[in-house]
């Protein structure tokens, strides 16, 4: 079987996806792009028919793709397309088993979240309160850092979600999971300051944080305002809401060491999601060790 014949089988598969599965043209183009790349790799390995393909050859496709600069996420898509194609060939009786079934792409490296150190957080929060919107922004910053909220949770807060007597808020997290969180004395103070001014913008809106038009503030507006305050306050790194959430988690873990507690505060379903912050904590401790411990100093 020649490369042309390999392509004919792929064309039959794409026709099946378009006619019987009724996949969108964009999805079909993505399948074709990935499978065309596989056919090119098959030509490099001397593969003459799909029936000759085994797990070792599929792994060689993966290795060659990586050498050509394909990232882990893109390689996972390529192998997924190949598995679907082979499943179809099995259903047509043209293959006995799917040779790509047990072959997976290497996992993409998990990037450690960046955080803002405590001094910079304090500098960020010490903003010039020359207008009501600045008071609102200070309250949002205090709540975001004080409770480690997601951006969607912050903009979704209603006044009814507050219990300022206990210093707590109710938030609706991912998967419609509700949780009750302490927000800290500073956040309570600045929410109260904002509530004193909030009536200048709207009186019948349920949302806690409003835009200058009196409607619930948008996530994009929050991102824009936080970035602007980061620049005004002279922070070297870009300030965005998720970075404040990361900073909350890192600083809490450094202070308490209570991974389970931080998991509950962040609303993570799995502890493994929270454990990434232990790497940040270790990096901090390692830098302190390298700077201070006599045995860590080189050449002495």
From Swiss-Prot:
Residues 111-290 form the Tyr recombinase domain. The keyword Cell cycle applies. Keywords: Cell cycle, Cell division, Chromosome partition, Cytoplasm, DNA integration, DNA recombination, DNA-binding. GO terms for molecular function: DNA binding; tyrosine-based site-specific recombinase activity. The keyword Cytoplasm applies. It is found in: Cytoplasm. One of its GO terms (biological process) is DNA transposition. FtsK may regulate the catalytic switch between XerC and XerD in the heterotetrameric complex during the two steps of the recombination process. NCBIfam families: PRK00283.1, recomb_XerC. Belongs to the 'phage' integrase family. XerC subfamily. Site-specific tyrosine recombinase, which acts by catalyzing the cutting and rejoining of the recombining DNA molecules. Binds cooperatively to specific DNA consensus sequences that are separated from XerD binding sites by a short central region, forming the heterotetrameric XerC-XerD complex that recombines DNA substrates. The complex is essential to convert dimers of the bacterial chromosome into monomers to permit their segregation at cell division. It also contributes to the segregational stability of plasmids. In the complex XerC specifically exchanges the top DNA strands. Forms a cyclic heterotetrameric complex composed of two molecules of XerC and two molecules of XerD, in which XerC interacts with XerD via its C-terminal region, XerD interacts with XerC via its C-terminal region and so on. This is Tyrosine recombinase XerC. The lineage of its organism: Bacteria, Pseudomonadati, Pseudomonadota, Gammaproteobacteria, Enterobacterales.
């Amino acid at each position: 079987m020649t490369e042309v014949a390999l392509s004919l089988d792929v064309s039959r598969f794409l026709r099946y996806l378009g006619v019987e599965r009724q996949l969108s043209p964009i999805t079909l183009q993505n399948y074709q792009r990935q499978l065309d790349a596989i056919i090119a790799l098959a030509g490099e390995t001397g593969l003459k028919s799909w029936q000759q393909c085994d797990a070792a050859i599929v792994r060689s496709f993966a290795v060659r793709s990586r050498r050509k600069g394909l990232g882990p996420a893109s390689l996972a898509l390529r192998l997924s397309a190949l598995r679907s194609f082979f499943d179809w060939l099995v259903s047509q009786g043209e293959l006995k088993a799917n040779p790509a079934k047990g072959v997976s792409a290497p996992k993409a490296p998990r990037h450690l979240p960046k955080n803002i150190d405590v001094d910079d957080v304090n500098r960020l929060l010490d903003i010039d309160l020359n207008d009501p919107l600045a008071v609102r922004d200070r309250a949002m910053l205090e709540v975001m850092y004080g409770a480690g909220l997601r951006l969607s949770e912050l903009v979704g807060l209603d006044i009814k979600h507050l219990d300022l007597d206990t210093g707590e808020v109710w938030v609706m997290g991912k998967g419609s999971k509700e949780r009750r969180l302490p927000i800290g004395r500073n956040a309570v103070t600045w929410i109260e300051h904002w509530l004193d001014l909030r009536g200048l913008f709207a009186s019948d809106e349920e949302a806690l944080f409003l835009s200058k038009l009196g409607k619930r503030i948008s996530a994009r507006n929050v991102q824009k305002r936080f970035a602007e305050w980061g620049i005004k306050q002279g922070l070297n790194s870009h300030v965005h809401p998720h970075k404040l959430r990361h900073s909350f988690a890192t600083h809490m873990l450094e202070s308490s060491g209570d991974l389970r507690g931080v998991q509950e505060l962040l609303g993570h379903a799995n502890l493994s999601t929270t454990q990434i912050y232990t790497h940040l904590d270790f990096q901090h401790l390692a830098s302190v060790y390298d700077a201070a411990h006599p045995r860590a100093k080189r050449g002495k």
